[in-house]
Amino acid sequence: MIRPPAAWRVAGLALLLATSAASAQQDWPNRPVQIIVPFAAGGSGDVLARVVAQYLTSSLKQQFVVENRPGGGGIIGTKQFLAQPADGYSVGMSSLSTMSLVPIINANAGYDPDHDFAHIAYIGGSPVVLAANPRTGVRTLAEFIAYSNSPGKSFTFASSGVGSDGQLWGELIASSTGVKAEHVPYKATAQALSDLVAGHVQFSTFTLSSTSPFLHAKSLNGIAVTAPERMSEFPELPTFKELGKPDLVGTTWFALSGPLGMSKDIVNRINQAVQMAVATPEGQARFRRDGIIAQPLNADEFTRFVAAENVRWKSLIERVGLVGAQH
């Protein structure tokens, strides 16, 4: 019996493996897909993840299951989905906070947003709203600044943790307006907003999507928002830009990312499904209601977007002195 040369056997094995891998990619998804959310239930990231999971389940004919893994300012959950096999069955909710803020603020984050991930799909961005407990009597930015100078009054703002997007926006707003406020970090957005409504803290800098139910219920006063222009669902809420603060424009964005090495075909399929979900009348209505701004980006465009955001926010973090502030 004549045996084929070793090189032939190796080539045949490589072809077999490549064919098997291609077949697995074509069959994807043939079992439930996990979306790891590095935040507690109830916040903007969690809500968006569940909305997207519902649409992906419908369009890709397989269950997309949200699992919350909060802690460490988003580091715990982010590192968990980063450590999963790059087979498309475990992806994660990424965000401005976990990609552009935490790795700069926390010297021990342990991951590189530009080189360790497959960035899949941008979902949407929510402007941040400066909100006040009504008992402060603060309704305008001028009143906010005046309140900060009132002797004997507690002046605190809540965020969802040290190094969170809420903290950074709060620090930026304080820096831009020349006020000094004490930061009160919480473990979850829902808990912080509950304490704000109860009057345990005076102000907050959360996303409009998280704060909107309280604004509609008049249990919080909206002072100004970081959107580039007034939102159609909140026409009475002024922008910082129109109030003379053009440096306070931007959104807290949310997206899907996965472990480096994911199949380009799977990445593109998820990206296209997310874009289709956002473009549906139901998706657009939900985004308008919650104050979320959509931006259609393919996977390559989103990857470049993340890199640009990292450069932009590093300079802002340096400005407020938070680079490497957390260990």
What are these model-derived regions, one by one?
Residues 83-89, 96, 104-191, 240, ...:
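Hinge/capping helix and adjacent helix->loop/strand transition within the periplasmic-binding protein
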Residues 125, 211-279, 308-311, 325-327:
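C-terminal lobe and pocket-closing loops
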